Amino acid sequence: MLKNPATKYRSFKPVTLTDRQWPSRTITHPPIWMSTDLRDGNQSLFEPMDAQRKMRMFKTLVQIGFKEIEVAFPSASQTDFNFVRELIEGGHIPDDVTIEVLTQARDDLIERTFESLRGVPRAIVHLYNATAPEFRKIVFNLEKSGVKELAQNAARTMKRIAATMPETQFTFQYSPEVFSGTEIEFAKEVCDAVFDVWQPTPEHKAIVNLPATVEMSTPNIYADQIEWMHRNLARRDSLIISVHPHNDRGTAVAAAELAVMAGADRIEGCLFGNGERTGNVDLVTLALNLYTQGVDPGLDFSNINEVARTAEECTQLPIHPRHPYVGDLVFTAFSGSHQDAIKKGFAVQKPDAVWEVPYMPIDPADLGRTYDSVIRVNSQSGKGGIAYLLEQGYGVVLPRRLQVDFSSAVQRFTDDSGQEVTSAQIWELFQQEYVQNTAPIHYVGHSLSEREGRERIKLTVDIHGTRRVLTGEGNGPLDALMHAIGVPVRIQHYEERALTQGADARAVAVAEMAGADVTGSAFGVGIDANLVTASIRAVISGVNRAYARVNAQAQENFFDAAMNDAAESVGV
C-alpha cells in the first residue's frame, strides 16, 4: 500500500446541499421492493442459474411477496429470452406481480427485448446507458451530447415499439448507469431528456433509477445526491425514484436507508446481497431492519431458513454464518456475560410485550428460528470443541446448523451433570439424539426398483408397534420414501459423506426436516455401510424428531396416510 494514497486516489466531491432535509426524517413505511436476483444477481454467478433453478427462485420471490421482479436480460442470451417466454406462456406470473427486463440503448437489442414480452399483461422495460466521465471518455469515447442523444434515441425506439403492443401495459424505467460517479447536473439533464420523450404522467408514472453502480462515497453523500435529484428533476410528480446501491464500500444497506429518507420511493437489490463484485444491497436485511423498527416491510421472512437454503441452492453461494438475521450464528452467544444477559432477558420477557431481550434485536421466532441455539458452549467455555471432538474421534463432520442444534443437547447434558463432558459421552449423546430414534416409526428394511425412470420403494416399518409395508414412487429414493410414509414434513436439506474408508467403509447421511406444524428444524442422522440405507435411516430419524416437535393434536394425525395405506399390515 502507498504511504500517500492521495497520489493515486481522489476523494469524492460532495454535493452542495446546505439545507438537506433527510437527516431529520425517519422511515415510516416500506419502499417499493424490486428483486433483481434473476438478472443482476444471476449474471454475477460463476455458474448462472439454469431454467429450473431460475423458476424455483422466481416462485420463492413471489411467495416472499415481491411485486416487481427483474427476470432477465432477454437480448443478452437465448437462455434469458426463453425464460421470459416460459414465464408468460406457462402462466407463471401472478396477477399482482410485474416482471421487469433490462435492455441497453441499442435499437436491435430493444426490439429483441420487446419481442420477449409479447403477450404479457404488464411489464417494466428498463433502459440504461453509462453517463459517468470515465465511461464517456474511456469506454464509449462520447461527449456529453452524444450520451444524451443515445439515451433519447433509445427512449424514442421504446415508445414506438410499445405503441404497437397495446395489449401490454408498459412502465418505462431509465437508469443513468454509474449515477453515483456522474456529475449530478448532467445526470439530471439526461434523465429529463429521456422523460421528455416518454412524457410520463402522475397517473402513469415512469421510473428513474439512480444506481450506485459502484459505491464511491459514504452513504450520506449518496443521500445528498438522491435528495438533490428529488428536488430538481423535472416531472417529479410523474416519476418513481428508485435506487440500486452496490456494496463496494460495505455500506449499501445504510446508503439505501438514507436514500429512502432523502426521497427514494423504490429499492432494487437481491436476497442476502448477491450481485456483481461485493454484491447488490441486501433486501432481506433492509426489510428486517424496518421490521425491528415496528414497520411492516410487506415481505414475509417468517421461514427465513427455507428462503436461505433456496438461495444457497439456486446460486451455489453460501451465506456467511454471521450474516444479519439469517446466519447460522447470529442468534448464538458464546460469551458468558452475553449468555447471562440473554437468560435474564428471556426470564422477564412477556409474550405480548415490546421485545427487550439484550443482545437480540429481533425475536428469532418471528423468523421461524428457535431459541435452542441462543446459548451454547464453545471451546473457550471449558465445555466445548464439540464438533472438533466428533470429527477427530469419530470422523463425523457436522453441518453448521446441526452443530448449533446438537450443542444445545450437550449444554443440557453438562448442566444436568455438572461435570466435564468427554469425547465418548458426546458420541453416545449424538447417537441417542439423532441416530437411534426408533419411535414412533422404526425402520425394518426396504427394497428399491426402477420403473420408467422413476424409483419405487417398498418399505417395511413399525409405526406405534404395528408393522406396515408401505410403497411409494419418486424421482429418487428419498422422494419415493417421502411419498411412501406420507407424513406432513419435507426434507429441507440433505447431505451425505463417507464416515470411514476401505472395505468396511460406512456412510453418514444428515437430513434436516421441516413442516408447517414443526417447531424449528428436526435433524436425523443415518449411518450404514450402504449409502441409500443411511439416507433412509436419516430421514426416518428426522421424522421421529419432527413428530416430537409438533403439538398433541398434530401428533394424532401425523401418520394417518401411512396407517391408512392399503399396503400389507401384520401384527408384530
Curated annotation (Swiss-Prot):
Mg(2+) binds at D40, H244, H246, N280. It catalyses: 3-methyl-2-oxobutanoate + acetyl-CoA + H2O = (2S)-2-isopropylmalate + CoA + H(+). The keyword Transferase applies. It is found in: Cytoplasm. Residues 31-305 form the Pyruvate carboxyltransferase domain. InterPro entries: 2-isopropylmalate_synth_dimer (IPR013709), AIPM/Hcit_synth_CS (IPR002034), Aldolase_TIM (IPR013785), IPM_Synthase (IPR005668), LeuA-like_post-cat (IPR054692), LeuA_allosteric_dom_sf (IPR036230), LeuA_N_DRE-TIM (IPR039371), PYR_CT (IPR000891). Pfam families: HMGL-like, IPMS_D2, LeuA_dimer. Pathway: Amino-acid biosynthesis; L-leucine biosynthesis; L-leucine from 3-methyl-2-oxobutanoate: step 1/4. Its EC number is 2.3.3.13. Its cofactor is Mg(2+). GO terms for cellular component: cytoplasm. Keywords: Amino-acid biosynthesis, Branched-chain amino acid biosynthesis, Cytoplasm, Leucine biosynthesis, Magnesium, Metal-binding, Transferase. GO terms for molecular function: 2-isopropylmalate synthase activity; acetyl-CoA C-acetyltransferase activity; magnesium ion binding. Residues 437-572 are annotated as: Regulatory domain. Catalyzes the condensation of the acetyl group of acetyl-CoA with 3-methyl-2-oxobutanoate (2-ketoisovalerate) to form 3-carboxy-3-hydroxy-4-methylpentanoate (2-isopropylmalate). Homodimer. PANTHER family: 2-ISOPROPYLMALATE SYNTHASE (PTHR46911:SF1), PTHR46911. Belongs to the alpha-IPM synthase/homocitrate synthase family. LeuA type 2 subfamily. This is 2-isopropylmalate synthase. It comes from Paraburkholderia phytofirmans (strain DSM 17436 / LMG 22146 / PsJN).
